[in-house]
């Protein structure tokens, strides 16, 4: 039997090209067939490197398959199937193509074995993510698309710079173990951190998810952040720096998630918290911890795709996703409410869900690592997940008293079909976790989550968190949702820092205009000053200092003139 050795992402990219020219009625079918083909290709090749070749003196590996890439590859292919099902009734041609490119680029990057292939595929996925926002009619979404482009361009520059350093240090372009204590490793770590939502960089996610469409937000959150997690697992397993970064990601965003009024922003903060758990597990680096990180990425992504699609449907139906304006939607959206409850319970780690299967691995991995602070941070993250995902989102959107009369118009069935498919996977993995465990890196995991000790631990965590939330609500210690937006670090980035950048740009423009108007005289002045400075090299130190002060005064005067003329 002939083995097909083709990067699975190529099937999605080819599907994107076909979808752009196919009739409107056929594009969802094309997307679904391309996603199914990608899933089939994810299981076809044997482990190892395939079809490597030399390019510009570097070894390029477009297909490398191991347990880590297969786990994320299967996950990305499944998410692509969900997005294809979601758009059967709803989507414009351009959005279908963009989602296929988003998924295809991320999937291609997961199977790439070198820096060149990885960054090329990852940036193709990034451009598709940006286009999903630019295709929206709202000005706020288009503005966020340009901000996302800026963040991801920064990630690209950092990655390419780090790759150049790493290639110079090692002589090869293989994407393998890296050290953040080298220039190349530090730059690539920062680049992947932007994608994964490290502190400060997380603001792009909490702004992009609410501005995108239901499918677009789910795709951006799933593919971009999990591609960052994959890159960290590939290059930085066992690095203690990631433990502390992951802990930071589980603390402050959890508070924002509980206090945020916009449920889609709250969901984005919740994803940052869960991503922090994965990154901390990667930092622990033991075989069990690496398996736990991959399993948690798998389970969390499935649940968050359901929640993102559901909140997108809520926004389309009610015209808002703000907790202060929602409530009572379970009566008119009962199926969506039920699917949201299952996904929320999975995030909270309830038994018989994929979240339980992954969280059991995470708890055991952190317990074996003997890191008390990390273990406590994980317990806090579980409690926060119960508070803001398992309780807040379902209650505020579907079961709280209605604040206004809910709309009665109908809605399409295809989003429910996509959410149902994801929910079946969530329950299926929870009931039979061995199916997921067989893919996990570095080797198939032999682990039984359903023993009485682990079940009791999870039940205690869930019940304790629920009681704590109830007590905090009754005593008004819980951060109640208020209309408006919370102040995050992006207020500083888009406020004083952006104003400073604008002033610097105006100053540079003023200096440039002054130079153009007085080009010859200014050039003569610089020539005389430079000659004077050079002549001081052999003179006493005091004279050097005196003339140096005059030089600085001249330069300060030129800068002041630039500010005046700006």
Question: What function would you assign to each model-found segment?
Answer:
Residues 1-97, 172, 177, 203, ...:
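Transmembrane helix-loop-helix hairpins at membrane boundaries of multipass inner-membrane proteins
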Residues 24-34, 144-149, 331-339, 410-422, ...:
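Alpha-helical transmembrane segments and their helix-start/interface "positive-inside/aromatic belt" motifs
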Residues 56-72, 178-185, 365-376, 449-455:
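Short aromatic-rich membrane-water interface segments that cap or initiate transmembrane helices
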Residues 58-60, 325, 404-405, 530-542:
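Cytosolic juxtamembrane amphipathic/interface segments immediately preceding
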Residues 65-76, 191-192, 375-384, 453-470:
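Hydrophobic alpha-helical transmembrane segments
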Residues 82-118, 128-406, 410, 431:
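Hydrophobic transmembrane alpha-helices and their helix-loop junctions in integral membrane proteins
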Residues 411-465:
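Hard-cation-handling environments
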Residues 436-456, 477-566:
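Aromatic-capped, Gly/Pro-kinked transmembrane alpha-helices
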